[in-house]
Amino acid sequence: MSNIIKLSRTTVEKYLSCPRCCVLDKKFKIKPPSLPFTLNIAVDNLCKNEFDYYRKRNKPHPLFLKHDIDAVPFNHEEIDQWRSNFTGIHYISKEKNYDFGGAIDDVWQKSNGELIVADVKATSKNNFDWAETFNKYEYPKAYKRQLEMYQ
């Protein structure tokens, strides 16, 4: 069997927007120039720190209470590994020869034990209308695909 193909949600999005760019990246290791996402990284870290604070106390985040989310941040010994860009979570299919993986932002646990994979997104808008944004722009569809990949 040839080398296993590593896939991630970023790979899927890259393929959907530019198949040639994806092949250049995956097969020939030629990467397009990219912009730094320092603001998003900072927001992710702030959110992770807040979730960790409530995770240690086994309490819901105040926003969970405000928005009637029946959950607490999931307490698991591997949470830091799952959230790391270098390790993340992986599903390996030996039959299809691929490794699909990526880092998550957080996991929450509902009172019935069900887990919710959470992905934090930042916006500069004061009033964010998800339905309007989803219908008007393409980028939210990538977020939806991302969450579907976690299922």
Predicted regions and their residues:
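Short amphipathic alpha-helical segments, especially helix-boundary/capping motifs
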Residues: 1, 24-28, 79-82, 123-128
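Charged, glycine-rich intrinsically disordered N-terminal tails and low-complexity linkers that flank
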Residues: 1-62
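Detector for Asparagine
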Residues: 3, 40, 45, 49, ...
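Phenylalanine-focused residue identity feature
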Residues: 28, 37, 53, 64, ...
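A short acidic/basic microdomain associated with nuclease active sites
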Residues: 60-96
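Mg2+/Mn2+-dependent nuclease catalytic core
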Residues: 82-84, 89-151
